Amino acid sequence: MRRVTRTIAAAGAAIACCVTMTACSSPFDLPISGSVQTLAPVEQQTQRVYTNPQGPADDAQPETIVKGFYDAMPAGVQSDGYRVAREFLTGSASAGWNGDSAALVYSGTPDFRRRANTISAPQGAESSLIVEVELQVVGSLDSHGVYTPSNSTQTRRLPYTLMKKSGQWRISSLESGVVISTADFEQVFRQVSVYQVSTSGKQLIPDIRWLSWRNWRTQAVGEVLSDAPSWLEGVLRGAGLSTIKLAVDSVPVKNNVVEIHLNSGINALNEEERGLLVHRIRLTMGDGNAEYALRITGDGVDYSDADANVKLTTEQPTAGVYTLTGGHIVSLASSSPLRVGEAPGYDDARGFVFSSSGGAVLRADGVVECLKSDGASCGVMFSGEPMRSITEGLDGEVWAVSENGRELHVSDGGKETDLKLDWLGAADSIVALAVSPEGCRLALAVEGEDTNGVMMTGVARNGDKTLSGLSKAATQVSVLRHVTMLTFYNDLNLVYATTPPEGNSEQQEAWRQMAPGPANAQRLPNGIITSMASGQISLSRRLAIVDDLGIVRSVSGSLDGSWTIADSQVTALGAQ
C-alpha cells in the first residue's frame, strides 16, 4: 500500500530552513514530531449550504426577473445545472447561454436599474427594455477555473435585455457566464489542486483551480489532460496528452470508488508516461492523497494500478525558524529558543536566511554576506552588489532582489545565477519575493506604473532540482498596493502584508489566500509588522511576524488563532 504525507512548508527568509519531513497541508497548527498515526484517506469537505431557488413569478417586473436570475445562478453552479436559472431566459437566450464558460465574483449588494432599449422590440414582443446591474467585481474565473483578481474600487455595469411576450418579462440577451457573490463563492466552487510535474521530474506543483461543485471531478480530469496556464509554461515536464479525452462526459462514483473512463489515447503512452498520468489524476482527485481509490480505464483496459511504482509525492520539506537576535542566531523550532550560532555586527540587518547548513544576512548597506553553519562569515555574495531584499529558496538557495528591483539573483552552493523577468513592465520593480515549498513557484510583490500587487510565476528545475530558469509569463494573484512582505504558509496558502504609511499600524493590511484565489483578511497582532515568515515554532507549523520593537509573535491553532510571543530583541526576520 502506498502512503503519501502532505506537508505544510514554507521558510522564512530571515529565518532558516531546517529540512525535515512533516504531514498536512491545511492551515492548522499541527505537531510535526512524535508518533505517527495511520489515518484513513479523507476527501476535502466544505460546510456547504444548498439553495433551492424559485422560478419567475407571474407578472414579475423586469428588475425582479433579473434579481431572480441572480438568485438562481449559484444553484446552477452548485447542483441543478442551471435548470431554474434558465426559466428566467427566453428560449433562444437559454440556448445560447453557457453558464460554465466564466464567472464574475462580486462583493456587496448589486444595484438593479432599468433603462430604455433604443433598439426596437423584436417581432412578436410586446415591448423591450434593459436592466443594468452595477457591481463591485473583485475577481473572475475563466473556463478552466483559473482565478484572476480585479480592482474592487471600480464598478462594472452588466446589461440584460428583456422582452415582454404574452404578458411576461424574460431575459432575451445576456453574456455567457455566471455572476456569483463572495458569500456564495466557496459554497458553489470547489478548490482543486491540479498536480503538475516540474521539468525536474521530481517535484509536484499544485496548480490551483476553482471548479463547480456539481461536476468538479469531471472538470478536474479534463484539466489534468489540458494545457497548463501560461504562467507555468516552460517549467513543466512535457506530457503529450492532446489525444487523451474522457470517453464519457462524466466521472461517476460507484461503491465509494471514483471511475474514470478514458479513450484509447492513453494506450499510446509508454509505461512511464501512463503511470505518471494516472498518478497525477489520483493526486488531483484525492487532494494530494496517493491512496485515493480510483478505477481508471483506457478503451476498456484497466490502468488503475499503473502508478504503483511512481515515487513522486506531495511531501515538502518544512522550515525551521531562526532569528538574528543580539548577535546570536536563535532557533525557535523547539519549545524553548536555542542558540545555534554567533553572528555579531549585524545590528541593523535588513534580512536574514538560515538553515542547518548556513545562510546569509542582508546588511544595512544592502550587501548580502554569506554565513557558515556556526554563523561565521564566508564572504559576500553577488559580487558585493547591494540588494533590496533576500529570501530562502529550495535546499539552501539564497534569492535576492537587486537594488533597482529589476533583476533576481540566486546563490546555490557557491554558484550564482542572474535572472530577468520578461513580463516585468519597464516602469515596474520588485519589492520582495517568496519561493514556494517545492521551489517551482515565485510570489513577487511588484509596484510600478503597469503592475501593482502580487504576481506569481514559475521556476524551471533541472533533474537534480537546481535552478534552470523562469517562466516567461506571470499571473496576478492580488491587486493590493504597497505589499512589502510575503510568505508561503504552506504549499497552497500565501500570506502577505503592506507597510503602513507614516507608521500608522491601523492602516496596515494583511491578507491570505489560496493562490490564485479569493483573498481573506489576515488578523495581525498590535504594533507595526516589519516582516513575516512561516515554519516550525515550538514543535508546530506557524506563521511568524516581527514588529518594529523586535518582538516575534506566532499564531497558533490556525491562521485565525491567537498570537503569542516567541522571541524578543530580534534584529531581523525575513520572509520567504
From Swiss-Prot:
UniProt cross-references to InterPro entries, sorted A to Z: Lipoprotein_LpqB, Lipoprotein_LpqB_C
Disulfide bridge partners, by residue number: none
Topology class, membrane: Lipid-anchor
Membrane-spanning residues: none
Principal location class: membrane
Gene Ontology CC terms, in alphabetical order: plasma membrane
Protein name per Swiss-Prot or TrEMBL: Lipoprotein LpqB
Gene expressing this chain: lpqB
